Design a protein with these regions (language model features):
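Beta-strand-rich N-terminal accessory domains
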Residues: 2-81, 229-230, 234-250, 258, ...
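Extended, loop-rich substrate-binding clefts of extracytoplasmic carbohydrate-active enzymes
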Residues: 27-29, 100-152
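Asparagine-centered strand-capping/turn motif at beta-strand->loop junctions
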Residues: 46, 160-166, 306
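Extended, compositionally biased flexible segments
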Residues: 66-116, 128-129, 295
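Acidic/His-leaning functional-site neighborhoods
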Residues: 109, 215-289, 294
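Exposed beta-sheet edge/beta-hairpin loop segments within beta-rich domains
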Residues: 140-142, 150, 286-297
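Hydrophobic core residues within well-ordered beta-strands of beta-rich domains
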Residues: 146, 156-158, 298
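Active-site/ligand-binding surface loops and adjacent short beta/alpha elements
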Residues: 169-171, 175-253
């Protein structure tokens, strides 16, 4: 078993956490830095901008679990299209200031690697802390600490810990905006959301109750409220199911853009690349946003595992 996460602890950084036999620090032509991970259980890549897990594949899996656009833009200050972008401290548009970027700033801010360890089985735990900058202080006026623990092995586990360092409560929205790699969006289904109420963005935020498994034949963008259970992504083409387990989350978002919207993004290409992805997002959004009291910590956890179909 991998060691328990230390996301809620205050850690002193290791002298040089980058010096680990399973870890390699690389820099691309645009100056973005990544951690390439190759341990006995899995391979992965994490961008230090946004502490963004862009790739993860267990060594028992025939196909990558996460989808990464062939047309992703690797530029400072811009989110990478694919993997697991972090949405924080708001989800979607900012509630009062339309000039601020969608989904918050955590995914485009530099993070610091504090600590690296490995279990006896080879699974790795990496702990990151978001760097506070003048830009983060401009967008969020109260003090906080944001720490992400990433555990990489046969399963991918994420623990995002928000600590309120202010003298008053504050409210956050948050999500792991996870892009999953699928054989063909038209042939997969999602179970675990039956009987949940959702807000349908495609239909003007109409509220409905979900009946049955989710299948996809057009643009799909639904926010499932008051949901804290597992979801299963069933993919007969890849002969697998991906299980999404979570805690500290009362919202699940399911999104796939379909052709017109995908082509309009600018970083998903103009072909059919969009057919190979679906987002299933562990979140706290809309009326499920989280109130954090002074000196308290809220942890958002998601865990992904691959099972034979």
């Amino acid at each position: 078993m991998p060691p328990k996460p230390l996301a809620t602890e205050i850690l002193q950084p290791q002298a040089d956490p980058y010096q680990h036999p399973y870890l390699k620090l690389v820099t691309d032509e645009n100056g973005l830095r990544y951690l390439d991970i190759d341990n006995p259980k899995a391979t992965a890549r994490i961008a230090l901008q946004g502490a963004h897990v862009v790739q993860w594949q267990p060594k028992t899996a025939a196909q990558p679990v996460l989808w990464l656009s062939d047309h992703a833009r690797y530029v400072a200050g811009r989110s990478i299209r694919g993997g697991v972008p972090l949405c924080w401290p708001w989800f979607g548009a900012h509630p009062t200031d339309s000039t601020l970027c969608s989904h918050g700033f955590a995914r485009v801010i530099p993070w610091e690697l504090l600590h690296v360890s490995a279990s006896e089985t080879g699974a790795m735990r990496l702990i990151f802390q978001m760097q506070v900058t003048p830009e983060t202080e401009r967008q969020l006026s109260y003090p906080f600490r944001l720490v992400l623990t990433v555990t990489i092995g046969n399963r991918l586990k994420l623990d995002l810990a928000t600590t309120n360092l202010a003298h008053h409560p504050f409210v956050i929205g948050e999500a792991y905006h996870t892009y999953f790699n699928v054989s063909d969006i038209a042939n997969v289904s999602v179970t675990g959301l039956e009987d949940c109420m959702y807000s349908d963005k495609v239909m003007g935020y109409a509220r409905q109750i979900e009946h049955g498994a989710l299948c996809f034949e057009r643009e799909f963008d639904r926010v499932f409220l008051h949901h804290n259970g597992d979801c299963i992504l069933n993919d007969p083409g890849y002969q697998r199911r991906i299980r999404i387990s979570k805690s500290g989350s009362n919202t699940t978002v399911v999104w796939t853009p379909w052709a017109d919207k995908a082509h309009a993004t600018g970083d998903m290409g103009t072909g059919d690349e969009w057919r190979r992805m679906v987002c299933i997002e562990t979140a706290n959004a809309l009326e499920n946003m989280v109130v954090i009291n002074p000196n308290k910590t809220h942890v958002l956890t998601a865990e992904y595992s691959v099972e034979a179909l």
